[in-house]
Amino acid sequence: MTDSQASADLESHLASELRRVIDEAAVRDLASRYCWAIDRLDRAAFDTVFLPDATAVLGQGEERGIEEIWAKVDLVLSPLTCSQHLVGSHVVEVDGDTATHRCQFHAQHVMKGCEGGDQYIVAGTYEDRVERTAAGWRIRHRDLTVLWTSGNPLVARR
């Protein structure tokens, strides 16, 4: 192998690795943007996270389309005094223009004056199928799995 071939191979490898790192960061960013959007009840921001025809299992049943997904989020979170969703332990696997993503979440829900206590914590995992679009990465499907809860479940019963 000549020096120019080795240099070209290295350049190609570095470009591929850079693309992978950028893609993985963009997919991880979706989870954070989702948290910010739902905690602020920011529909415009929410629309930059999911595909219009996305699906999601956020509890019982499957929500079909971004309108149903938003309606479910709004139903649960809009009555609250506040909520704070945190994500971590991300694992991203990119395959061309599709990816899988999983992470853990910790969600604090607060409703001041709720009988039985004003806080409810839900912790679990998000597992996503994600697609690259002209506008960037978007979630095609999300599965939410609850691993544990603490506090007053009446806070988030809607």
Model-predicted regions and their roles:
Residues 1-36, 40, 48:
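Short, low-complexity N-terminal intrinsically disordered segments enriched in polar/charged residues
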Residues 2-5, 100, 123-153:
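Short beta-strand edge/turn micro-motifs at domain boundaries
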Residues 9, 13, 84-89, 108, ...:
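C-terminal-biased regions
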Residues 25, 80-83, 119-121:
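Transmembrane beta-barrel outer-membrane domains
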Residues 43-107:
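A solvent-exposed, acidic/Ser-Thr-rich amphipathic alpha-helical stretch
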Residues 85-87, 121-126:
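Short, surface-exposed coil-to-beta transition loops
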Residues 107-111, 130:
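Beta-strand elements of well-folded, non-transmembrane domains
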Residues 113-120, 155-157:
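Short, surface-exposed loop/helix-turn segments at secondary-structure junctions
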